[in-house]
A protein has these predicted regions:
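Thioredoxin-like thiol-disulfide oxidoreductase module
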Residues: 70-95, 101-105, 123-127
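Thiol-/selenol-based redox modules, centered on thioredoxin-like
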Residues: 115-129
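Bacterial Sec-dependent signal peptides at the C-terminal "C-region" and cleavage site
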Residues: 18-30
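Hydrophobic membrane-insertion alpha-helices, especially the h-region
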Residues: 9-21
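Local sequence-structure signature of Cys/Sec-based thiol-disulfide redox active-site neighborhoods
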Residues: 28-65
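N-terminal Sec-pathway targeting helices
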Residues: 2-10
């Protein structure tokens, strides 16, 4: 009885170790950025509109030249259906928001409301954008 418990615990520990360390080993393969989705509002009240207008400037400054091809801009005010796909899938609650996605649509990074040029540029560099 004691021996079988030890075997079970040893097997369980081995399985847990593989589960814990396998993602760390795989994390050396950094996912590649395929698309950046920017969800904003052109019609909103007060501070929401101000945040979105500021976000528009930041996104415009960061996504220029070759980087512009990565960006998909979705305006909730004029294209609710397209925005709702992302809102539902990624459980978004604030605007403006940037979504960094890989080729399979997996979320790599997100940033909402207070968009910062340096932080976004750093994340672009990290994911190869």
């Amino acid at each position: 009885m004691v021996k079988s418990r030890r075997i079970i615990l040893t097997v369980l520990a081995a399985v847990m170790a593989v589960g814990i360390y396998a993602p760390i080993a795989a994390s050396g393969d950094q996912p590649k950025l395929a698309q950046v989705v920017y969800i904003t509002l052109t019609k909103a009240c007060g501070c929401a509109l101000t945040a979105c207008q500021a976000g528009d400037i930041v996104v415009g400054n960061v996504f220029n030249g070759a980087r512009k091809a990565l960006l998909k801009r979705v305006d909730y005010s004029t294209n609710k259906e397209a925005a709702k796909v992302y809102i539902k899938k990624y459980r978004l609650t604030q605007a403006p928001v940037l979504l960094f996605l890989d080729a399979k649509g997996n979320l790599l990074w997100t940033k909402a409301v207070d968009l910062d040029e340096k932080e976004i540029a750093d994340q672009l560099s990290q994911f190869g954008g």
